[in-house]
Each structure stands twice: as structure tokens, then as C-alpha cells.
């Protein structure tokens, strides 16, 4: 077995400097008789293979900043689920001394001590991470052990409510439902065997088995990654900043493809619509109440009238949904898409049990027969998505339903919620593959949808997955949260933790899902206000309390209606953040510590976040709040609602609150684009564009961008079929200069010219003239809302408004 218990040798420190003790001074130990020793090495095209007295170890650089380390490389192992291209490797430089090997990809370097065997990792000359006793095999588990540095903060582990810094915690690596959670949970639906360090590295335990992560809980300076079985590999990624770290990480684990634009619109959802009549009435209610709507989501009643006994039917209950194809076609004409829930379980009482058995689609018991077991919904089995037969059978069902008009898919219970340990899948038993089940399900469905509709982006919402599942378009949510203030308060932490490790579209059941005897009106309003400024706007909950805003009282509707419409007006901003996520992995929701990477205290903040490039959002998560303390980073900020200017040295701002809005700040130098509100994204147009610029002398140079395409084509970026509007503002003592340009080949339906209004906030009254590409226009001093001038200045609001047409040509606007 692999085992090493030893300190670092003096020779190592002489060769590679004295930075190693910054990990903390390891206790010097005698070399253990089971220690691993180097025997020889071979540099191959696929990496460096080191032979030791206990087997082979393979090191592969996946990029200049990412390395995969596979122990027991000479034995048969499960494939990597985390890596987007597990077989690829880049060439790296190898140097050797008598006692050490140095293997470098560029940004990241592995330094290998031969006797006893040990690997340490450097970013340039800075020690990032070192194995303590490397890889170990015990009778009941395998594990890796690494040193933690003094003061090092650790994020990660996926969905947990433990505080942002997870150091000092030990928790299971086993996806499991936590029904009705509130403000604490150590084990939830979607865990991740990965961490992000304040030293700006990400470490992934590329193992799908049941296990645990111990982040300095048992031993304060030791990180231990454990699993019952499975792949003995880890991936280390380095960066020079948090954004570059995320970019490097998603380069090797895969980037989230752009979702369809409609995924960013308004959803109607509950548990659940029990009939076609109720579903139609809900869509009509949105129209009657003048609320935008893009999607209606059908929970499990679409295939059976009861919660129990029907799972696995995977076909319409014609008694309660007599004309589902007509229903979906009617919705489509109104710009409303239909999303159906599916689960991976097939009950013995369902219509498809015999067919699934005949098709060999189900996982097996140890005797090779279809495994049946008890779950909440009845007795049944689980589809083996790891087998060709199971994938083929499940895919054919999705194909048939998609042909009928289903526009997107909701995959529920994919932890899996029930997964007996003696269940046998095609590639391993339940405990070995458990955490990769949702990942493989998403991969299968994503490929099936692209094969069937190569010109459309799939919509796949799932409750569980693995590191890298984002590359299959997975849109996860945070599960069955309780209808409590604690449930709402936990959502920022959950979203940020998942977003940092690739899942930019993580979101919650707005309003809460579980329990609650009656509606808490204030909490509901606050949750749906928060929802406007997070990735997916989807109210959802048990149906004894209506989830949808259209079924609330008049005051609630009056508060929420303009906010939902605002989200539609802000779609260019939200969609551009989605584009950035696809391009670089940058999350849509971003933590405050991105603003000051040298301030580790910001890592602990879980009350506020950046929404896209320019907005700082602070949800209200307590009842009766009259003012909120906002940890605004140093600089100039503007109140999004009132336009008030604030300057802070980094001390928190205290803002009064009311029931109509939550605190949102805009950073100085921000460009905020808007389009006219529509009732569905099918009517989305950007031929009329409003751009708000928040001017301030503290920002002499500002840049922004707006990404536009057809909202559907999965290859729009690859084919350059988009319109990227770039914006730059240069501020001097007596002039403000804007440069506007467009790049990209364009897309079907793209406006050649846009009627553009540029609104400059905090504008000086010194400007008298506007030059547009050399043509001079006098600036009128008037109320811009009632003055049809091409350029006007509103003294009371301190806003300057410019109206012009923006075609394909670049524009230079100069205020003087």
C-alpha cells in the first residue's frame, strides 16, 4: 500500500528554499517501514510516470496551471468524472537531481522528493500545497493527506451551511437529501469533493465514492480526503487571482454552456399542478395579472394523480392531462415553455417496470437481477445511467417527450435519494459511483438533447452532480429548503460556495419549499426580491401555500410586479454575465473577497454578494428590518433605487430599508444596459437600448460590454454569431469621452441599428456640448423626461441624457 509518515528532509530545503515551513512546521517523524520510495521514472507523452516500491504514480499537466496526480496508475480504475478531457495532457519540463525531480507545466510546478517519496506544489517560488503522508490504503478506505498552512482559509465541499470558511470541519462526501433545512447543514443534496484555498489553489478529490473530507477537524494542520473505494487521484489547480483560478479550474473541468435566454426569465412552479386545467389557469393568471412568464414547470402529477405509486410511468396521466400536446402548443404560442420533472426511479407498480426490466435498463442486485427496494414513493428500482442499456432506454423516453413539445427537463432525486449499497451498476457498486450518478445522468441527457435538437440549447435542471457537471449544462438548485427566515438566510452562502467551483446557475426555490402552515408575507416578498438578482427566477413550494406571485394579495403583487419586469429589462446585463461565465467560468454571483484579495476577513462574508460586474446586493433575511449594514468595498457607490452617491473607505454603509426593495448598490464606473420590458423572452428585442453610466471622477477609465445573440444557438460563441457591444468611458477634468464599438459576425434577427439612450448619472453641469463622431450638438438644460432633445441635462437629478442611433460603425462621443 501507499503510505508515508515523514518530515521534509534538510536536502529538500537546501535545494528548494525555506518557504516550506510556511505550511506550519511539520513534526519530524521517523521514516515509517511502509514508506514509499522512488525506484525510477519515465517521461512519456501522457505525463511523468514514477515507479515506486508500492506501484506507479502518474503526473499529468492538464494545463500550465493544473495537474492531475494518479496513484496506483498501473491498476484498473474508474475514469475521471471531473476532467473535461481526461486523456489530454500538455508537455511539461522535467529536471532531476540526485534526490529530487522537478516537473513543471509553467505556472505550477511539482517538486518530488525521492526518498521517502513526497510531492510538493509551487506557484513560481511560492509553496502552495504539500502532501503529508500522501496516499494511504487501509482496510476500509483510501485517503490522501495534505498540510494546511497557518491562517489558511478553506472554502468548498459544495452544498453545506457551515459558514464560508470550512476549516475546522469534517463532513461526509455523500450526496443526500436534507428535507426542510434551515440555517445549518453538514450534508446536503450536492456535495463536492473539492476545496478552494485562500492561497488561491483548488484541490479536487477525483473520486465518486462515499467518503469524507476532514479540513483540520481531527488534526488542525491536516486536510484529509477519504473514500470507501474508487479512483485514487486528485487534481490541483493554481491561479494568480481568484478570477484566474476559476478560469484555470473551469478550463480543465469544463465551462457551462450558455443556457437558452428563456432560462433567465420568470418561471411558474409548485409541487404541483395537478391537472391540465390548473396548469392552463396558472399561465392565464400570469397574463391577467400582467406578470412576465417564460416557463411553466410540471411536478410529478403530470404522470400520476398521487405522490406514491406512479413514479416511472414517464408518460402523461391522460385522466388529468387529457390534451397535453395541445396544451404545450398553446403555451408555446404565448411564449411559454413547458418543463417536466423526471426521476431516475421506476416503481414496480408503474407502467414501465416490465419494459425497463426487458430493456435491462435497471441497476442490478448482487445476483444479477433488477434491484428492487423500498423508497418513499413505493417499491422500485433505479435506472443504470452508467450502462449502455439504461442510457439508451432513458434517452428514448426523453426523445419521445421532447418530440411532443417539452422544452426543458427537471431531474429530481439524483443524489440518488435512495441508493442501497449492494446495488450494482455497470461500472461499480452504489457506494463507489454514488456521487457521480447525477453527473452521468446530466451527461446522457445533455448529449441526447443536442443530438435531437442540434440548433437549440438544452435546459437541464438537476439536484445533484459532481465536479465538472456544469459542462453538461446542469442548472442546480439548493433543494427542499424550509419556508423560514433561516432558509432564506442560508441561500447566499450556498450559492457562493457552489458558484466558486463551477456552478454559476445555482439558485433556490424562491419563497421556500417545505412546511409552513400559512404564508409569511414579509419573508415571501424578501425571498422573491432577492430572486430578481440571482440566476434563475423560479418560485417553488408545496402547494398548500401558493408559490407564484400572481396568487398573492394586491400589496404583494404591487411590490413584486415591477421587480419581475425589472429583471426582464435587465436581461442584457444578466445575459452578459452568463456569457462571461461561459467564456471564463466567472460566476454570476460573486463573493465580496473578489474586490480585495488581500483581505481574508472578507472570505467569511455571507450576507452580500456581487451580481455580475457592477451590482452589490444585500438580501434582507430577517423580519422587521429598518436598516441594513452593507460591507461595501472601498470606493464610490450609488444607490440603485435612489441614485444617492456614497463614498466609503471600506467601513460598512448603513442604509434604511422599506418593504418595496432590498439594498442594491451600483459601483462607480458601471455601465448598466436595459431593454423595454416584455411579457416573455420570445418578444425580446434590443433594437431599443438604454445604457446607464455611473460617472465619477474617482474612476478615470471605465469599461463594459453587452453580449447579444439569438438566445438559442448552442454554437453562437464558437461560430462568432453574436454582437458584442464594447463600451469605454474616459473621464478628465473637463471632458467625458465615450467610445462605443461592435464586434462579431452578428446573428439572425440582429438589429442593424439600435435606438440608443445613454443616461449619465452623477453628471457634471459643466458640459455644454456633445460631439458625436465630430458633429457638435448643444446640450439642453431641461427635464429630460419631457424634452425631446438629443442631449439634455437634468439639474435636479444630476443626469445627462444622450439620444442617438448606433449602427455598425464605432461611435466617439465627447462631452465638453
Swiss-Prot record:
Xref: InterPro entries: DUF5110, Gal_mutarotase_sf_dom, Glyco_hydro_31_C, Glyco_hydro_31_N_dom, Glyco_hydro_31_TIM, Glyco_hydro_b, Glycoside_hydrolase_SF
Gene3D superfamilies noted in UniProt: Glycosidases, glycosyl hydrolase (family 31), Golgi alpha-mannosidase II
GO molecular function annotation: carbohydrate binding; hydrolase activity, hydrolyzing O-glycosyl compounds; oligosaccharide 4-alpha-D-glucosyltransferase activity
A UniProt-annotated Pfam family: DUF5110
Enzyme Commission number, as recorded: 2.4.1.161
Keywords: Glycosyltransferase, Signal, Transferase
Reactions mediated catalytically: Transfers the non-reducing terminal alpha-D-glucose residue from a (1->4)-alpha-D-glucan to the 4-position of a free glucose or of a glucosyl residue at the non-reducing terminus of a (1->4)-alpha-D-glucan, thus bringing about the rearrangement of oligosaccharides
UniProt-annotated binding residues for acarbose: 299, 417, 463, 480, 540
GO term, biological process aspect, one: carbohydrate metabolic process
Residues annotated as catalytic: 412 (nucleophile), 415, 480 (proton donor)
Domain of life of the organism encoding this protein: Bacteria
Residues making up the signal peptide according to the UniProt record: 1-24
Family classification: Belongs to the glycosyl hydrolase 31 family.
Described purpose of this protein according to its UniProt entry: Alpha-transglucosylase that specifically transfers single glucosyl units from alpha(1->4)-glucans to the non-reducing terminal 4-OH of glucose and alpha(1->4)- and alpha(1->6)-linked glucosyl residues. Acts on amylose, amylopectin, glycogen and maltooligosaccharides, with the highest activity with maltotriose as a donor, and also accepts maltose. Does not act as a hydrolase: weak hydrolysis activity is only observed on the disaccharide maltose.
Protein name per Swiss-Prot or TrEMBL: Oligosaccharide 4-alpha-D-glucosyltransferase
Organism: Cellvibrio japonicus (strain Ueda107)
Amino acid at each position: 500500500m501507499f503510505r508515508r509518515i515523514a518530515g521534509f528532509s534538510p536536502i529538500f530545503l537546501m535545494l528548494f528554499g525555506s518557504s516550506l515551513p510556511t505550511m506550519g512546521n511539520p513534526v519530524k517523524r521517523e521514516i515509517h517501514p511502509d514508506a514509499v520510495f522512488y525506484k525510477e521514472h519515465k517521461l512519456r507523452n501522457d505525463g511523468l510516470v514514477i515507479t515506486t516500491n508500492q506501484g506507479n504514480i502518474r503526473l499529468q499537466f492538464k494545463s500550465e496551471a493544473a495537474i492531475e496526480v494518479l496513484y496506483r496508475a498501473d491498476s484498473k480504475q474508474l475514469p475521471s468524472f471531473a476532467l473535461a478531457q481526461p486523456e489530454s495532457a500538455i508537455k511539461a519540463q522535467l529536471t532531476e537531481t540526485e534526490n529530487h525531480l522537478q516537473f513543471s507545466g509553467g505556472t505550477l510546478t511539482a517538486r518530488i522528493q525521492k526518498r521517502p517519496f513526497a510531492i510538493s506544489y509551487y506557484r513560481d517560488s511560492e509553496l502552495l500545497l504539500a502532501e503529508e503522508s500522501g496516499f494511504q490504503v487501509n482496510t476500509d478506505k483510501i485517503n490522501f493527506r495534505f498540510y494546511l498552512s497557518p491562517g489558511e482559509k478553506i472554502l468548498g465541499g459544495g452544498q453545506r451551511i457551515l459558514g464560508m470558511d470550512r476549516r475546522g470541519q469534517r463532513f461526509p462526501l455523500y450526496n443526500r437529501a436534507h428535507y426542510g433545512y434551515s440555517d445549518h447543514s453538514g450534508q446536503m443534496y450536492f456535495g463536492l469533493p473539492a476545496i478552494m484555498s485562500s492561497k488561491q489553489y483548488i484541490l479536487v478529490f477525483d473520486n465518486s465514492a462515499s467518503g469524507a473530507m476532514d479540513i483540520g477537524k481531527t488534526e488542525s494542520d491536516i486536510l484529509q480526503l477519504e473514500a470507501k473505494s474508487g479512483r485514487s487521484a486528485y487534481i490541483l489547480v493554481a491561479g494568480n487571482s481568484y478570477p484566474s483560478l476559476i478560469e484555470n479550474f473551469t478550463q480543465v473541468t469544463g465551462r457551462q454552456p450558455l443556457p437558452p435566454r428563456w432560462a433567465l426569465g420568470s418561471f411558474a412552479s409548485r409541487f404541483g399542478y395537478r391537472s391540465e386545467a390548473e396548469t392552463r389557469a396558472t399561465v392565464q393568471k400570469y397574463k391577467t395579472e400582467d406578470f412576465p412568464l417564460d416557463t411553466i414547470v410540471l411536478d410529478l402529477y403530470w404522470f400520476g394523480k398521487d405522490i406514491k405509486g406512479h413514479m416511472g410511468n414517464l408518460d402523461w396521466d391522460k385522466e388529468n392531462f387529457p390534451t397535453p400536446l395541445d396544451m404545450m402548443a398553446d403555451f408555446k404560442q404565448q411564449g411559454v415553455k413547458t418543463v417536466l420533472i423526471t426521476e431516475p426511479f421506476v416503481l414496480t407498480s408503474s407502467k414501465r417496470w416490465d419494459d425497463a426490466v426487458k430493456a435491462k435498463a435497471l441497476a442490478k442486485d448482487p445476483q444479477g437481477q433488477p434491484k428492487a427496494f423500498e423508497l418513499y414513493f413505493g417499491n422500485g428500482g433505479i435506472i443504470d445511467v452508467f450502462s449502455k442499456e439504461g442510457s439508451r432506454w432513458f434517452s428514448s423516453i426523453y426523445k419521445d417527450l421532447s418530440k411532443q413539445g417539452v422544452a426543458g427537463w427537471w431531474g429530481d432525486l439524483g443524489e440518488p435519494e435512495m441508493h442501497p449499497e449492494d446495488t450494482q451498476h455497470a461500472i461499480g457498486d452504489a457506494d463507489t459511483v454514488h456521487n457521480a450518478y447525477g453527473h452521468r445522468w446530466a451527461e446522457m441527457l445533455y448529449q441526447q438533447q443536442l443530438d435531437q435538437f442540434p440548433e437549440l440549447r438544452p435546459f437541464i435542471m438537476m439536484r445533484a452532480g459532481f465536479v465538472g457537471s456544469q459542462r453538461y449544462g446542469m442548472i442546480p438548485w439548493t433543494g427542499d429548503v424550509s419556508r423560514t427566515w433561516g432558509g432564506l438566510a442560508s441561500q447566499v452562502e450556498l450559492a457562493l460556495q457552489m458558484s466558486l467551483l463551477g456552478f454559476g446557475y445555482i439558485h433556490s426555490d424562491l419563497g421556500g419549499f417545505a412546511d409552513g402552515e400559512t404564508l409569511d408575507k414579509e419573508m415571501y416578498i424578501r425571498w422573491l426580491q432577492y430572486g430578481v438578482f440571482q440566476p434563475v427566477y423560479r418560485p417553488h413550494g408545496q402547494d398548500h401555500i401558493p408559490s407564484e406571485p400572481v396568487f398573492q394579495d394586491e400589496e404583494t403583487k404591487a411590490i413584486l410586479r415591477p421587480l419581475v419586469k425589472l429583471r426582464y429589462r435587465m436581461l442584457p446585463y444578466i445575459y452578459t454575465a452568463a456569457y462571461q461565465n461561459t467564456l471564463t467560468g466567472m460566476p454570476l454571483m460573486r463573493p465580496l473577497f473578489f474586490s480585495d484579495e488581500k483581505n481574508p476577513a472578507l472570505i467569511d462574508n455571507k450576507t452580500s454578494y456581487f451580481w455580475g460586474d457592477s451590482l452589490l446586493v444585500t438580501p434582507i433575511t430577517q423580519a422587521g428590518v429598518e436598516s441594513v449594514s452593507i460591507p461595501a468595498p472601498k470606493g464610490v457607490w450609488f444607490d440603485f433605487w435612489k441614485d444617492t452617491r456614497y463614498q466609503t473607505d471600506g467601513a460598512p454603509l448603513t442604509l434604511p430599508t422599506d418593504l418595496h426593495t432590498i439594498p442594491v448598490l451600483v459601483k462607480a464606473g458601471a455601465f448598466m444596459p436595459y431593454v423595454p420590458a416584455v411579457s416573455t423572452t420570445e418578444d425580446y428585442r434590443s433594437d431599443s437600448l438604454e445604457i446607464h453610466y455611473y460617472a465619477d471622477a474617482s474612476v478615470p477609465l471605465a469599461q463594459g460590454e453587452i453580449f447579444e445573440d439569438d438566445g438559442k444557438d448552442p454554437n453562437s460563441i464558437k461560430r462568432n454569431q453574436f454582437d458584442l457591444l464594447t463600451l469605454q468611458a474616459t473621464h478628465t477634468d473637463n471632458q467625458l469621452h465615450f467610445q462605443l464599438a461592435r464586434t462579431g459576425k452578428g446573428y439572425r434577427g440582429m438589429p442593424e441599428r439600435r435606438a440608443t439612450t445613454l443616461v449619465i448619472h452623477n453628471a457634471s453641469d459643466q458640459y455644454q456640448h456633445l460631439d458625436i463622431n465630430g458633429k457638435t450638438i448643444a446640450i439642453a438644460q431641461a427635464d429630460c423626461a419631457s424634452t425631446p432633445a438629443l442631449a439634455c441635462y437634468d439639474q435636479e437629478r444630476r443626469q445627462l441624457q444622450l439620444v442617438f442611433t448606433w449602427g455598425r460603425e464605432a461611435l466617439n462621443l465627447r462631452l465638453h
